[in-house]
């Protein structure tokens, strides 16, 4: 009898990778030997107790800090020494970088402003009408994709906190990121807003990679494909949520006891 192998689903491609990442501050090592692979069309969570090094890792990946050792690769290109503005143009975008939510502009105008750079209009004084029509069309499409069409003419300052976060994500998406980094996107939200943002992140990740720091473990369990747990600047555990949540080391790190 001939053995027939059953094809397995192809592993999503790695779009952002770190190897041996370390960051020293004087005699203190904040991040040590971190290896990380972020895959296209997946949501990857970076979790851990306070002081675990999550924000430092984000700052290293987005080049706001230079690593003391290790390498970072984006879409196959070494970006270890690349400045943050160039990294953003290459497709690695962190939400606060584009916090172009101007409170006195309308929702639509906020998105139009954010879209000017990727559409080549940021530094053009005279613009053909066709270019503006294209810009407006892209802005309307982007608002529709995040569910903000009804609020298109609302002034940003009048939006609820949750809707402002949606608008912030929309302005970030205007740069067409290949990898989107979100730093605690659910912070300060009520449950209704949390559900909306979680579903938006799930949709966004269908066409790009998402790496997020998040303390809401219910959200992590619901939408994340892969979880990396940090403790004292080192990787403690990784895998899917079910795997890491059962790890006694993770329980100890979060709860102080393996029996928690």
List the predicted regions and their residue ranges:
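Glycine-rich phosphate-binding loops of nucleotide-dependent enzymes
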Residues: 2-260
